[in-house]
Amino acid sequence: MICPKCTSLSIVKEGTRKRKTGRIQEYSCNSCHKWFVVPVEKEVKGERESIFLEDIEPGDILEYKTDKVFRLYCATDVHHGANEHHYDKFNEFIDEVDSDPNARWILNGDNIELIPPNYKISQRGQSMEPDEQHISFIKRIEHIADKLLFIRGGNHDMIRSVNILGFDVSKVMADILRVPYYRMPGYTRIKVGDVTWYFVSGHGKSGGKNGDLELDKMAAVYSDGDVFFLGHNHQLYAKPLDSLRVLGDKEGVRRRWYIRGGSFLEYADYARYSFFPMVRTGWATIEFAKDKIRAWTN
């Protein structure tokens, strides 16, 4: 096996991902530290492998499998193209993902600002046109797209583009970057060796001050979750929730996590006008191991 990035022969076979179209094998390169994937069973449509062209529909479960500890870097509410987008902070995120050999990451909606013409709010809130936002953002992240687990749309990108044009800009981004696309909230099954964890994620809808209330609703619907992750309200925190369960003839502690993923948007004019609370920019990182899950904010 030769690395397609740098042609090195120093390749390590990593975990696999299960898809509806088959299974893909992941590899990492010891020379350039990049990752690439090879379909275990190739199915070709035209000139592209169908394995990358996948929507995770409501009710479907995406699976990621690995034999070692890995860290999931969660980017939500990036708002690339907004006047107040925090370029330095998101560049820091990109560098972290790029330098971590055990990294995977997600895009969880509101990835670009996307204020279309004649929309209910002024286009003055963005620093470039929507098409330029889409193109420049893809160029900005494409060198770490090999570590991207999935993309989800939010109210800024997916909902606006679908309602106005019947065109899902987030789905197109996922197709270009060849990663699965979540249109709705849902489970991701994560297998670390013989241990299975369930990561529940969605963009979010509520702007309420208490971010736990929406996470409570999510946990009630997705009751098998171990980690519950939402964006949208730009709050940034990760906190454990412990409960008691039955382990044989004794009680044991089950730990789950509530996470609001923050944003990469500084104090915008609309927030200032409405006296929204000021929150720091940043992201959440989740580490999945065989024995436990850890989570923290950056």
Q: Over which residues does each language-model region extend?
A:
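Short Cys/His-rich local motifs and their 1-3 flanking residues in nucleic-acid-associated proteins
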Residues: K5-L9, S31-W35, N233-Q235
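Short, non-ligating residues that shape and space the ligands of small metal-coordination modules
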Residues: V12-E14, W35-P39
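Cysteine-rich micro-motifs
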Residues: T21-W35
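Core catalytic region of metal-dependent phosphoesterases/phosphodiesterases
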Residues: D55, G59-I61, T66-R71, A75, ...
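Conserved beta-sheet core of the metallophosphoesterase superfamily
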Residues: Y198, K205-W296
